[in-house]
């Protein structure tokens, strides 16, 4: 995401945007630069999600609480206008799917619920930056494909799962980047001082806190999960250019005995598809 010159525009990322709603503000119009020219900071991200939510009936913006450094953990609930008008009913109907006593629920017209979480590790920034493009596309595109998607989907968009870590990284990277981009991995921009920005305020790896659930950021995510019980959970990470991409199921011998074999079968199918 950050190997580009400053001349890129939205069409570089999104293709033809001629059918986009012009009343929906672009990321650049709010944060002051094109996505990818600089690392978006959490304060600029917060500004954009608040502003763009004012102009669309497709989104409900939720302030879930604040981190240890007093940054807001935002959740954008994005779906069609008609679904927004009955969002609580949709949520309650969806939760009934988890009730084993309800075996004959008609799901033919029930939207799927998808949670999309970005950058739980603060120095894996492409997720949060890409989320700006996704939220703009979902709120501005008037294509029939997008309308159909939103009519059949409730998207729980969590643009920054680690606000404090992401802020720490964006400040470091923007302070140390060159006007002429330097691809050398030894450049100061790519080598943060300890404790770096992977962690939250207390230097804890939030990707290890889903089960112990000790930290505010994890509490807020799990609260969203239990309120909705989404059909699909996505957790967008980033890996270095010299690394192979990790997919479950991983090494079979390391499987927790409490994890079902079905989980192994499903994740292997997903990994095989992407491979």
Model-derived segments and spans:
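Active-site-proximal loop/hinge segments that shape catalytic or ion-binding/gating pockets
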Residues: 214-274
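Bacterial Sec-dependent N-terminal signal peptides
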Residues: 1-9
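Surface-exposed loop and adjacent secondary-structure segments within mature catalytic domains
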Residues: 8-19, 74-80, 90-96, 101-104, ...
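Acidic/histidine-rich, surface-exposed loop or edge segments in extracytoplasmic proteins
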Residues: 17-37, 116
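The substrate-binding groove and active-site-proximal loops of carbohydrate-active enzymes
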Residues: 33-39, 120-125, 202-215, 222, ...
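Divalent metal-coordination and catalytic microenvironments
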Residues: 41, 70, 119, 157, ...
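A non-catalytic alpha/beta surface segment that caps or lines the substrate-entry region
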Residues: 42-82
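Loop/turn elements at helix/coil->beta-strand transitions in domains of secreted/extracellular proteins
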Residues: 56-59, 71-73, 110-113, 151-156, ...
């Amino acid at each position: 995401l950050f190997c580009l010159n400053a001349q890129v525009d939205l069409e570089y990322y999104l293709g033809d945007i001629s059918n986009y709603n012009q009343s929906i503000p672009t990321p650049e119009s709010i944060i002051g630069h094109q996505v990818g020219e600089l690392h978006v900071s959490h304060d600029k991200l917060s500004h954009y999600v608040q502003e763009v939510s004012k102009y669309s009936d497709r989104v409900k913006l939720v302030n879930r609480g604040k981190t240890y450094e007093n940054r807001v953990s935002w959740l954008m609930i994005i779906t069609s206008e008609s679904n927004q008008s009955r969002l609580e009913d949709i949520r309650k109907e969806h939760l009934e799917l988890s009730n084993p006593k309800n075996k004959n629920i008609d799901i033919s017209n029930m939207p799927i619920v998808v949670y999309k979480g970005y950058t739980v590790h603060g120095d894996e920034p492409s997720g949060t930056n890409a989320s700006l493009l996704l939220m703009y596309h979902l709120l501005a595109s008037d294509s029939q494909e997008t309308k159909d998607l939103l009519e059949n989907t409730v998207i729980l968009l969590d643009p920054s799962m680690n606000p404090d870590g992401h802020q720490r990284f964006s400040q470091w990277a923007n302070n140390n980047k060159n006007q002429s981009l330097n691809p050398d991995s030894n450049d100061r921009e790519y080598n943060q001082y300890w404790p770096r920005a992977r962690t939250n305020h207390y230097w804890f790896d939030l990707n290890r806190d889903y089960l112990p659930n000790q930290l505010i950021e994890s509490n807020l995510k799990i609260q969203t999960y239990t309120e909705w019980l989404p059909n699909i959970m996505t957790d967008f990470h980033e890996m270095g250019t010299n690394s192979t991409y990790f997919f479950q199921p991983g090494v079979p011998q390391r499987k927790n005995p409490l994890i079902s074999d079905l989980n192994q079968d499903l994740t292997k199918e997903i990994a095989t598809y992407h491979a």
